[in-house]
Regions:
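Substrate-binding pocket helix/loop in short-chain dehydrogenase/reductase
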Residues: 99-100, 107-109
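Catalytic loop of short-chain dehydrogenase/reductase
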Residues: 139-163, 169, 173-176, 188-202
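A short, exposed helix-loop element centered on a Lys and neighboring polar residues
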Residues: 123-124
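Active-site loop of short-chain dehydrogenase/reductase
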Residues: 2-3, 84-85, 130-143, 178-181
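The beta1-alpha1 cofactor-binding region of Rossmann-like NAD(H)/NADP(H)-dependent oxidoreductases
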Residues: 61-73, 105
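Conserved glycine-rich cofactor-binding loop
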Residues: 11-12
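C-terminal beta-strand-loop-alpha-helix "lid" module of Rossmann-like NAD(P)-dependent dehydrogenases
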Residues: 181-231
Length: 299
């Protein structure tokens, strides 16, 4: 069944790959990104060329996830165009790399804004439509770092992604009775095929960072990145994340997985998440809320 889908952070990386893959699968896709007439104008042109060349229903959408007016306008446009919205893909995110102490509190807040509050802005704008329809799907692009191995120097990103994952889990139960499903996609560390690492932020406090990088932790940054790259199999492909999202969207209502891991490096997140998700399910059963584990078919 053809779905109307919005993806945040779709100018590059998993978002761009997923937008194209979902459009190829026959869906109407709105690829959200900021500054469509500015810094991302070339990405918009590439997307429009791709849509025309492949004859798919794919559209660039001005959507700045840190701006409530921008988010509200974007969602309103989709509903005006299509009279519905079926799937939200929370993909927008930004990485930062460096010693935790060298990042200012303001930098932590900014990462939290992009990685966590952005999803809340989109949900507040879009969920009323999904609830009205009595059916929908919310896909969250999480990270294996929330429960798997955590190499050093990525603390702002890890903390934000952990918060996002917790938000996704909480929303799942609160949306089930509205007929809205939740699927959490858990990518591992893909050092190739995305700009995640290349475009990562750095600490604002250069003096504090230097104390680490020129002191007992000299060379650690290079060692950590080299180690992550070495763990990644040669055939690891970021397109696998896009394919996982397509597979979830294309499954029938009630058959979509709550969590799906795409982690070529196998950092242990699947094991820990399996335990955590089972504990969650057991608690809901113990307090008489087992029905929240599955969406209720309302339409």
């Amino acid at each position: 069944m053809k779905q109307v889908i919005v993806i945040t952070g779709a100018s590059s990386g998993f978002g761009a790959l997923s937008a194209r893959a979902l459009a190829r699968a026959g869906h109407t896709v709105y690829a959200g990104m900021r500054e469509t007439a500015g810094r991302n104008a070339s990405q918009v042109a590439e997307l429009e060329y791709y849509a025309a060349e492949h004859h798919v229903d794919l559209h660039a959408l001005e959507l700045d996830v840190v701006s409530t007016p921008s988010v509200e306008a974007a969602i309103a446009k989709i509903i005006a165009d299509c009279d519905r919205l079926d799937v939200i893909v929370h993909n927008a995110g930004h990485m930062a790399f460096g010693p935790a102490e060298a990042f200012t509190p303001e930098q932590f807040a900014q990462l939290y804004d992009v990685n966590v509050l952005s999803a809340q802005r989109v949900n507040r704008a879009a969920l009323p439509q999904l609830r009205k329809q009595g059916r929908g799907l919310v896909v969250w692009v999480s990270s294996s770092s929330t429960r798997g191995g955590t190499p050093p120097y990525l603390s702002p990103y890890f903390a934000a992604k952990a918060a996002m994952d917790s938000l996704a889990v909480s929303y799942a139960g609160e949306l089930a009775r509205w007929g809205i499903e939740t699927s959490i996609i858990v990518p591992g560390a893909f050092t190739k095929g995305t700009n995640h690492f290349a475009h990562s932020g750095s600490p604002a406090d250069k003096t504090r960072a230097a104390e680490y990088n020129e002191g007992p932790y000299a060379g650690l940054a290079e060692q950590a990145l080299k180690g992550l790259a070495a763990l990644e199999p040669p055939d690891a492909d970021a397109n696998a994340v896009a394919e996982a999202i397509v597979s979830v969207v294309d499954k029938p209502f009630g058959k979509r997985p709550f969590r799906l891991h795409v982690d070529p490096s196998q950092d242990g997140a699947e094991i820990v998440n399996g335990v955590a998700d089972r504990v969650r399910a057991e608690l809901l059963r113990r307090i008489g809320l087992e029905d929240l584990l599955r969406p209720y078919a309302r339409s």
